[in-house]
Amino acid sequence: MNCLATTIIITCKPTLISDMAVAIDPFSDKFPYFNRSSQRCRLQSLTNLDFNFLAQSFNHTFEDDNIHRSVSSPCFSIAASANMEEDLKATTAPRIEILGGQRVPTVRALVAEVTMAMVSGAQPLLLPSGMGGAYLLQTGKGHNIAVAKPVDEEPLAFNNPKKSGNLMLGQPGMKHSIPVGETGIRELAAYLLDYQGFSGVPPTALVSISHVPFHVSDAFSFSSMPYKVASLQRFVGHDFDAGELGPGSFTATSVHRIGILDVRLLNLDRHAGNMLVKRCDKKEAYNRLGTAELVPIDHGLCLPECLDDPYFEWLNWPQALVPFSDTELDYISNLDPFKDAELLRTELHSLPESAIRVLVVCTVFLKQAAAAGLCLAEIGEKMTRDFSKGEESFSLLETLCTKAKASVFGKTSEDSDYSHEGNEVNTELQCGMFKFDGGDTPCEAEISEVFHVSKPPLVPRGPRANTIPNDVTASMSSSQNQRITHQEKSAKEKKRGGKQERCTVRSKSPPISPNHDESKGVSFVDMTTVEWDTFLQSFQTLLQDALSKGSTPRLGCSCEI
């Protein structure tokens, strides 16, 4: 039986079992709060994976006289364990179950620490900032441990404690491409994809928390909501956020590492408020140039289900114009988008395949753009939609994906003998194949214009500038492991009319508002595995051609610092 996660039942008397259950790995995490040799508390353990399996084992024991016990609990009483499931269900003490990230030691340690604090009487404190329900969890001595965000208390959700919405889970949320209730799993995805803590995402878990006084709407009784699913992120001590200081205080390395993560995940909400500021040297003042490090938090609005308009606060910062260092280029070149996709499929089963495909596309885009010598600001600009003369136009990334997708369906039609003669049908395939909201899909003439939109000049980086990563092409041949769930195969995109014009200043953190009328963007959910592989090959070719053409600086931008 798998013993990665066990439940530690704390008892102070041989015949009494307390109401507390802690999910940890006693073999690797070295839980610091108890001494196994202590006579004050006796620890009993049992596997906490499947109570049905335990019940079946006990029935088998009584019927066949075949004693079945876990090797981790040789002294466990069969009589006591027979009622263990009922005892744990009947308890009113706080319990936490890890739903995602249980294989990561830092996640298990975080959950164990939070659980012990809560069973000792610590109460979650609702933070006044933000639009959603975020709770600060502390130890009995008042030390900050983590921040919990229940998914049903997200902005616009029906159980929001700040009365900012009444939407049910699964409806379009703050961004139409991310449904209500699905930000928590994206918080965990960002942590899992931040390999070796390169960007500094704090340890994050997806948990189920029961019998904890979170907010409950008047329309629901607590008895009907015994537990809540929430993201749990370790608290990071800080004095400011990036919005309280000028960008000149931050190191270029810190900005680059956050930007690399944002590009990979297509972060739709990287504003100054979710970048915490820490000093590199406590003796240095914050106002000195390049002395502060940034810690990224709040990744619930990343990995959208279709291409959307990202918001990168760092886009106009001077650090984003500095070329990538060799260390950063090596990190980017070693990224494997298909390995990342398989990781998310394995660890996060409920994350839609369409969101995983967005990760693959954005990672391929990042790798080729960095290899071509583009700086972070140039890459971010090519992923961001342009707003001029009262109209919003697609980004270069969206335009390339539109052309690649059109070529895929064009070839599919020819292979299926459904194609017709003449250029009229070809134009129809390119202009009417995709479902966009609030406007018509740009036709070939409009698409070609995007390749001539002025952009900052390329930054030469020696031999790297003329090489396109070969691992992307090689990985495409092995992309047969891409899977499409039954739900996604039957999903149908719904059109929403109208286009909402935005007049926000991109250098400031914009207020988030529901974007149900925005253009829906390019979606990859309607492609089969074969079509997806063909799309990636076409997309890589189009991207290589677009990057090789170069461009002139856009008005208001310069790569000189």
From Swiss-Prot:
Region (G-loop), start-end ranges: 127-133
Binding, ATP: 128-134, 149, 233-236, 298
Record region (Catalytic loop): 266-274
Region (Disordered): 456-520
Disulfide bond entries: none
Enzyme class: transferase
One of the record's GO cellular component terms: cytosol
Protein origin, superkingdom: Eukaryota
Pfam families linked to this entry: PI3_PI4_kinase (PF00454)
Location of the region described as Activation loop in the Swiss-Prot/TrEMBL record: 296-322
Compositional bias annotation for Polar residues: 467-484
Catalyzed reaction equations: a 1,2-diacyl-sn-glycero-3-phospho-(1D-myo-inositol) + ATP = a 1,2-diacyl-sn-glycero-3-phospho-(1D-myo-inositol 4-phosphate) + ADP + H(+)
PROSITE patterns cross-referenced by the UniProt entry: PI3_4_KINASE_3
InterPro entries linked to this entry: P4KG1-8, PI3/4_kinase_cat_dom
One GO molecular-function entry: ATP binding
Keyword Nucleotide-binding (UniProt): yes
Alphabetic keyword roster: ATP-binding, Kinase, Nucleotide-binding, Transferase
PANTHER family: PHOSPHATIDYLINOSITOL 4-KINASE GAMMA, PHOSPHATIDYLINOSITOL 4-KINASE GAMMA 1
Function, as annotated: The phosphorylation of phosphatidylinositol (PI) to PI4P is the first committed step in the generation of phosphatidylinositol 4,5-bisphosphate (PIP2), a precursor of the second messenger inositol 1,4,5-trisphosphate (InsP3).
UniProt similarity note: Belongs to the PI3/PI4-kinase family. Type II PI4K subfamily.
Protein name, entry field: Phosphatidylinositol 4-kinase gamma 1
Organism of provenance: Arabidopsis thaliana (Mouse-ear cress)
Origin organism lineage: Eukaryota, Viridiplantae, Streptophyta, Embryophyta, Tracheophyta
Recorded name of the encoding gene: PI4KG1
